[in-house]
């Protein structure tokens, strides 16, 4: 019942491989690389709780969709198989109480601003906001309209701005990766 040919058994799989570079995805993570080096040298890992929390938080960001206009189509595209945002540890959630990141995509009107703030207040700490597209960043095409908020940063604090009209799915993924780097850099206890 055992393995008859041990040459056919894969002993050391590379894990998730980045298709662009053909390098395992975990090799880009400095914390993970340091932990595996310590584990290989000593047999155990020493770290601070803050570093461990930051590492786990960056790999499990749950984003809530707040799609207001055409940018929401590009936001949905990041979850599709071509870009697959979940390979970076980011997954969509429908409830603000279960999400860490809110992506504001599209034109924010004065009537929608209180609802945006209410949803933001329902998110647990630490919470992050990505402003996606020209309309969410500064009003965009409708900047001079009486009914448009000239940037969602007037309502909620924004961590990452993704420019474009509409920004591509690659730009949003770059913004998500920039947010992950920001979380690693600033920490959760210091925020």
Swiss-Prot record:
Names of the cofactor(s): [4Fe-4S] cluster
Protein family according to the UniProt entry: Belongs to the complex I 20 kDa subunit family.
Binding annotation for [4Fe-4S] cluster: 70-71, 135, 165
Known catalytic reactions: a quinone + NADH + 5 H(+)(in) = a quinol + NAD(+) + 4 H(+)(out)
Protein name as it appears in the record: NADH-quinone oxidoreductase subunit B
Organism: Parvibaculum lavamentivorans (strain DS-1 / DSM 13023 / NCIMB 13966)
Subcellular location: Cell inner membrane
E.C. numbers: 7.1.1.-
Pfam families: Oxidored_q6
Principal location: membrane
GO BP of this protein: aerobic respiration; electron transport coupled proton transport
Residue spans crossing the bilayer: none
The keyword Transport is assigned to this record: yes
Keywords recorded for this protein, A-Z: 4Fe-4S, Cell inner membrane, Cell membrane, Iron, Iron-sulfur, Membrane, Metal-binding, NAD, Quinone, Translocase, Transport, Ubiquinone
Function: NDH-1 shuttles electrons from NADH, via FMN and iron-sulfur (Fe-S) centers, to quinones in the respiratory chain. The immediate electron acceptor for the enzyme in this species is believed to be ubiquinone. Couples the redox reaction to proton translocation (for every two electrons transferred, four hydrogen ions are translocated across the cytoplasmic membrane), and thus conserves the redox energy in a proton gradient.
Membrane topology recorded in Swiss-Prot or TrEMBL: Peripheral membrane protein
EC class: translocase
A Gene Ontology term for the protein's cellular component: respiratory chain complex I
Molecular function terms from GO: 4 iron, 4 sulfur cluster binding; iron ion binding; NADH dehydrogenase (ubiquinone) activity; NADH:ubiquinone reductase (non-electrogenic) activity; quinone binding
Subunit structure: NDH-1 is composed of 14 different subunits. Subunits NuoB, C, D, E, F, and G constitute the peripheral sector of the complex.
Cofactor note: Binds 1 [4Fe-4S] cluster.
């Amino acid at each position: 019942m055992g393995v008859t040919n041990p040459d056919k058994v894969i002993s050391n799989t590379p894990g998730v491989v980045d298709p662009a570079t053909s390098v395992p995805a975990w090799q880009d993570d400095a914390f993970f690389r340091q932990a595996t080096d310590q584990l290989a040298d000593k047999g155990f890992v020493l770290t601070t709780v803050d570093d461990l929390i930051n590492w786990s938080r960056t790999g499990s960001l749950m984003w809530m969709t707040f799609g207001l206009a055409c940018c929401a189509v590009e936001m949905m595209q990041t979850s599709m198989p071509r870009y697959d945002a979940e390979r970076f540890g980011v997954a969509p959630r429908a409830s603000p109480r279960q999400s860490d990141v809110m992506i504001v995509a599209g034109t924010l009107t004065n009537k929608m601003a209180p609802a945006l703030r209410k949803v933001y207040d329902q998110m647990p700490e630490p919470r992050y906001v990505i402003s996606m597209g020209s309309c969410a960043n500064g009003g965009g095409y409708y900047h001079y309209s009486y009914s448009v908020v000239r940037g969602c940063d007037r309502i909620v604090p924004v961590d990452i701005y993704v420019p474009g009209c509409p920004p591509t799915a690659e730009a949003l993924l770059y913004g998500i990766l920039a947010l992950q780097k920001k979380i690693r850099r600033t920490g959760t206890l210091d925020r």
